[in-house]
A protein has these predicted regions:
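Glycine-rich anion/phosphate-binding loops
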Residues: 60-79, 102-115
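Positively charged, low-complexity intrinsically disordered leader regions
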Residues: 2-27, 32-41, 47
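Residue-level signature of catalytic and energy-coupling elements of molecular machines
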Residues: 21, 88, 129, 170
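Single conserved hydrophobic/aromatic residue that forms the stacking wall/gate
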Residues: 218-230
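Anion-binding alpha/beta catalytic cores of soluble intermediary-metabolism enzymes, centered on
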Residues: 103-163, 198
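Short, glycine/charge-rich flexible loops or terminal/linker lids adjacent to PRPP-binding catalytic cores
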Residues: 30, 34-49, 96-102, 106, ...
Length: 230
């Protein structure tokens, strides 16, 4: 069976993390650059041959949208340079909160991003802690949805925190927080949000006993603080 050489590249949105990943893999990042033009456009370029290679491109797609566009263009460039496989490693999957129509006449941003990645020619996607697990179903290519709990649970255990509770920032994060709570044998606190409008929380209620507890994960709300968190 043919073995295809692996090469790791980074977009400008994840350079530090990409260097750490490459070092852990026992290699260095591949040579690439992004050319800037006077009208504001940019053009990624691979500065070494990737023909027949399995190419990993590490790039988060958080705003600004240039990060997403840069990733799409790098995937396209790798395809046109005859890479064997192109794997997009997306530590932070932007637009993941837009996983459904929560009101009339709005897009489903996460599905659109999935379509764009597939149209660019990606063969596989790897990402961390998706906002909604169902986003994996938006793709027609394999998606490796990884979880940070494998790293953070041992770390939190090593701190030997007394009276520990695990907090979820909202109902959507309850499943993830529950995973931590089970591994850490700790009770869970959930925040229930009622939004007045986009990005504005009109009311937040902490569900669970937080008085005198040490909370871990993820956002500690003001209502939670007022109820006696230490």
């Amino acid at each position: 069976m043919a073995i295809h050489k692996i090469k790791i590249f980074s977009g400008r949105g994840s350079e530090y993390l990409a260097e750490k990943i490459a070092a852990s893999f026992g290699t260095t990042l591949g040579q690439s650059e992004v050319l800037r033009f006077s009208d504001g456009e940019f053009q990624p370029c691979f500065n070494e041959s990737i023909r027949g290679c399995t190419v990993f491109i590490i790039q988060s797609t958080f705003p600004p949208s240039d990060n997403l566009m840069e990733l799409l263009m790098m995937i396209d460039a790798a395809r046109r340079a005859s890479a064997y496989k192109v794997v997009a490693v997306i530590p932070y999957f932007g637009w993941a909160r837009q996983d459904r129509k929560d009101r009339p006449r709005v897009p489903i941003g996460a599905k659109l991003v999935a379509n764009l990645l597939m149209a660019a020619g990606v063969d596989r996607v790897m990402t961390m802690d998706l906002h909604a697990d169902q986003i994996q179903g938006f793709f027609d290519v394999p998606v490796d949805a990884l979880y940070a709990s494998g790293i953070f649970v041992p770390y939190i255990k090593s701190l030997n925190i007394e009276d520990l509770s695990i907090a979820a920032p909202d109902m959507g994060g309850a499943k993830r927080a529950n995973t931590y709570a089970k591994h850490l044998s700790a009770p869970i606190i959930i925040s229930h949000k009622e939004r007045a409008k986009a990005n504005v929380v009109g009311k937040m209620t902490a569900i669970g006993d937080v008085k005198g507890r040490n909370l871990s994960l993820i956002h500690i709300s003001e209502p939670t603080r007022r109820r006696g968190i230490s």
